[in-house]
Structure formats: structure tokens, C-alpha cells
């Protein structure tokens, strides 16, 4: 659980959400331990604060929105999203079963390293066909740290040519939430792709 004093202090003094006393930003955080209370880690972004007897904030690392407005919960989320995890030996049947889910709008595709996948012709054709049907496919890395750089290797460039969009250094969790949010607000596939290439609340790093 949370330390009530520490949590209250953190809540009142910073504009960005933090996890527990580790002070890690929510948008870059993944759960990495099933047994430990200290279960969340942020590998692509440094801690925003260190909490002990006192709280020390790393102010330059904290995301500051352009304007400060009261919290507005967003309930319009489109759940027609799926995760496609690429693995060695993946079969056409597995990919086809996911890309042909009725009503599917977006896919978070977990790839190798800096955004690579097997260069199977059938895989590229299936991805291209899905994109042409209006499905937005976002490429995120399976690695805990690092970023998708689809221009780096030929396999990544082929994914770009098929219409796959870079997820940069987004976590899978954040990419899923972002797709749900964007489609939930009635955006077209092209509008969703445009918003995937920019940071809405500091959730991705674009050089």
C-alpha cells in the first residue's frame, strides 16, 4: 500500500502522476514483479522524485502541461484494441486470428529490439492488408528499455512500408491506453496515426 503522508505530499506538489515512494512517472512505468510491493519500474525515464524523510523532486524531469486545468476523467475508451506479440516461429494462423478480430481498430505489435520482426512475406502482406482496412498498428519493443527505430534495419523499414506506425519508447500498457483514448474520442485512423507521432502527456520521447 501507499504511505498516506508521502502520497498526499506527492499529490499536492507535482503536476504529473507518480507511483508510490519510488517517484516514477506513470506513463513510462510497467509492473515487473508479481510478489514485491515495490513492483513497478520505469526503464526509459528517470525517477521524478525520491521520497525518504523528505521528498526531493527532479524538477527538470517532471512533465509540465501548457495549461493547468482541474482533473477531467475520460471515460470514452474504445476497447477494440489487441496486442500482437511477435515471437520466433510465429505462424500465419496466429497473426490472422488477431488481425481479423471483428470490429478491431488498433493493434499494439510487440517486436524485437529496436522494432524488428521476421521478414516473412506473408506477415508483411497481412500487416499491409490490415492497415489498408483501417486498422492502426503501433510498433513497440519487447525490451524493457530502449526505443523503436524502424529506419535502423531493413526489417524495420519493411514494417514502415507496410504502414506500421512507430511507438517510439512507449510501453505496451501506454500504447494500448493511448489507442483506446484516441479511438474512443471518435478519431479516424489517420488522425490516430498523427497523434501517435506526438506526445500528449509526456508518454513518449521523440528526438
Labelled PLM ranges:
Residues 13-114, 119-120, 198-207:
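Accessory alpha-helical/coil subdomains and C-terminal extensions
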Residues 6-7, 101, 120, 129:
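Polar helix-capping/helix-linker motif
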Residues 1, 19-20, 141:
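Short beta-strand/turn micro-motifs composed of small residues
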Residues 4-5, 186:
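Short helix-loop capping/hinge motifs at secondary-structure junctions, enriched
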Residues 10-18, 186, 190:
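N-terminal targeting leaders only when they are immediately followed by extended low-complexity/repeat-rich tracts
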Residues 1-2, 8:
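A generic, well-ordered mixed alpha/beta core segment in the N-terminal half of proteins
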Residues 5, 23-25, 144-147:
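Short, active-site-adjacent cap segments at secondary-structure transitions
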Residues 111-207:
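C-terminal non-catalytic interaction/assembly regions of soluble proteins
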Amino acid at each position: 500500500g501507499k504511505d498516506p503522508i508521502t502520497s498526499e505530499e506527492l499529490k499536492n506538489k507535482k503536476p504529473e502522476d507518480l507511483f508510490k515512494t519510488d517517484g516514477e512517472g506513470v506513463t513510462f512505468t510497467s509492473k515487473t514483479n508479481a510478489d514485491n510491493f515495490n513492483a513497478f519500474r520505469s526503464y526509459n525515464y528517470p525517477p521524478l522524485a525520491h521520497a525518504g524523510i523528505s521528498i526531493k523532486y527532479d524538477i527538470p524531469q517532471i512533465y509540465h502541461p501548457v495549461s493547468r486545468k482541474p482533473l477531467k476523467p475520460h471515460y470514452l475508451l474504445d476497447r477494440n484494441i489487441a496486442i500482437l506479440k511477435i515471437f520466433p516461429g510465429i505462424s500465419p494462423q496466429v497473426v490472422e486470428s488477431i488481425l481479423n478480430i471483428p470490429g478491431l481498430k488498433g493493434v499494439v505489435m510487440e517486436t524485437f529490439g529496436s522494432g524488428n520482426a521476421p521478414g516473412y512475406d506473408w506477415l508483411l502482406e497481412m500487416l499491409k492488408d490490415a492497415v489498408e482496412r483501417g486498422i492502426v498498428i503501433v510498433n513497440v519493443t519487447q525490451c524493457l528499455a530502449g526505443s523503436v527505430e524502424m529506419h535502423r534495419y531493413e526489417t524495420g523499414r519493411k514494417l514502415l512500408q507496410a504502414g506500421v506506425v512507430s511507438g517510439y519508447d512507449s510501453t505496451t500498457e501506454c500504447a494500448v491506453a493511448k489507442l483506446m483514448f484516441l479511438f474512443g474520442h471518435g478519431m479516424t485512423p489517420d488522425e490516430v496515426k498523427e497523434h501517435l507521432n506526438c506526445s500528449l502527456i509526456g508518454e513518449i520521447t521523440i528526438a
